[in-house]
Design a protein with these regions (language model features):
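Primary mode marks residue(s) on the alpha4-beta5-alpha5 output face of response regulator receiver
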Residues: 86-151, 155-277, 284-375
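Sec-dependent N-terminal signal peptides
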Residues: 13-17
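Bacterial N-terminal signal peptides that target proteins for export
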Residues: 2-12
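N-terminal low-complexity, Pro/Thr-rich disordered segments
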Residues: 27-113
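C-terminal motif of bacterial Sec signal peptides marking the signal peptidase cleavage site
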Residues: 21-24
């Protein structure tokens, strides 16, 4: 049968659709996360890495995504960081905030007087929330918004409503959360872990908010609706030069060996497998999201300060995830592949006042607070 232009166009369309759906939640290499575990806190365990103003783009990672170096659109309704909702955007697009609104929010934040430090708190700039798993689905409202079932499976905690159709405003409106602070309606997720095909849920997750910068005193809250990812879902091999993409053993006895495929540790019976993954803490001050969901964020540079391209210090979000696995770690995989494909997503929906108080009182004063934001 002779091929016709119409037939060739139809076949090409089907192939492109197939590629888009196969891409799932595949991430794009960019700003690295944590580099080493900490036995005490979730913050301060990652050495700042050299930032990049825009991570490399990959058209296969996000269907229809423009290059990370593309110029953000000048048009479109902006979002005010503290009161307005984040506007919807096509997968892979820039979301630009209102500059005047952000400037006003920043001025108001630094005008507030921090609460006097009482007692003798630990001199570490951080606060945290403790969370339990809420649900699983194959959605990703950051990378594949509105594409139900388009991703590999994820394990969610925090906001119970998170799905492909989630927006900043829908997250803030949803109640309750599986984290121990009712003021935090944010959504958090990672690829689901399996052992021989059965889901392995974390026993607990602690989300630390802190600063890895030399001077944390100028840290300010990230705006409502900011979203970001860290890690690389496409990475299936060890890359120690890029990020601390490793699981480790926490508890008495620690690591006693490696799994048969060498990708997971074997822990003593008195220890559990733990994974820490940390997000950048420098923001460009202009965008709630970027084409690759990383280019609007960066790590501090070698001086311990934010780079000129991303001059705004914001809290460094760090997940510390504990899994109920120790001696038997054979047959473990992630929904995204090997252990080295571990990545994480964060979608901010904190109540503005609650987040601002914690950042001003705890991070800016360089002291450790609990989940309620108290010393």
């Amino acid at each position: 049968m002779r091929s016709t232009p119409t037939l060739r166009r139809s076949v090409t369309t089907l192939l492109l659709v197939g590629v888009a759906f196969a891409g799932g939640c595949k991430d794009i290499p960019g700003t690295p996360g944590a580099s080493s575990p900490s036995s005490d806190t979730g913050i301060g365990s990652s050495d700042p890495q050299t930032p990049t103003s825009a991570a490399p783009s990959d058209a296969s990672a996000t269907p229809g995504a423009p290059s990370a170096s593309a110029t953000p659109p000048a048009s479109g309704k902006p979002a005010t960081p503290s009161t307005s909702t984040a506007p919807p955007t096509a997968s892979g697009g820039w979301i630009t905030i209102d500059p005047a609104g952000q400037a006003a929010a920043t001025k108001a934040f630094f005008a507030r007087k921090p609460k006097p430090v009482t007692g003798n708190p630990v001199k570490v700039p951080e606060f945290n929330v403790g969370c339990k798993v809420s649900h699983h689905n194959s959605d990703d409202p950051i990378v594949l918004p509105k594409l139900v079932g388009g991703s590999h499976n994820h394990t969610f905690w925090g906001n119970k409503s998170t799905d492909a159709n989630s927006t900043a405003e829908s997250l803030r409106a949803a109640k309750p959360t599986t984290c121990n602070s009712p003021d935090d309606q944010s959504a958090y997720w990672v690829p689901t872990m399996y052992q021989n095909g059965k889901v392995v849920d974390p026993t607990e997750v602690t989300v630390y908010y802190g600063s890895r910068l030399k001077d944390p005193s100028k840290t300010q809250p990230f705006p409502f609706g900011l979203r970001m990812i860290t890690g690389d879902a496409k990475n299936q091999v060890d890359t120690p030069d890029k990020q601390g993409n490793h699981f480790w053993c926490a508890g008495i006895g620690g690591e006693v060996g490696r799994s048969a495929d060498k990708t997971f540790p074997v822990c003593a019976k008195t220890a559990n497998i733990v994974r820490q993954i940390t997000f950048p803490d420098c923001w460009d001050g202009k965008h709630l999201d970027s084409p690759n969901h990383k280019a609007h964020m960066a790590n501090g540079d070698h001086t311990g300060a934010c780079p000129k391209s991303h001059p705004v210090p914001v809290p460094s979000v760090s997940f510390v995830i504990s899994y109920p696995l120790s001696a038997n770690t054979d047959g473990i995989t992630l929904a995204s592949g090997t252990s080295f494909s571990m990545h994480a997503d964060f979608f901010n929906a904190w109540k503005d006042e609650a987040l601002a108080a914690r950042v001003r009182n705890c991070l800016d004063q360089g002291v450790k607070c609990n989940s309620a934001g108290n010393f």
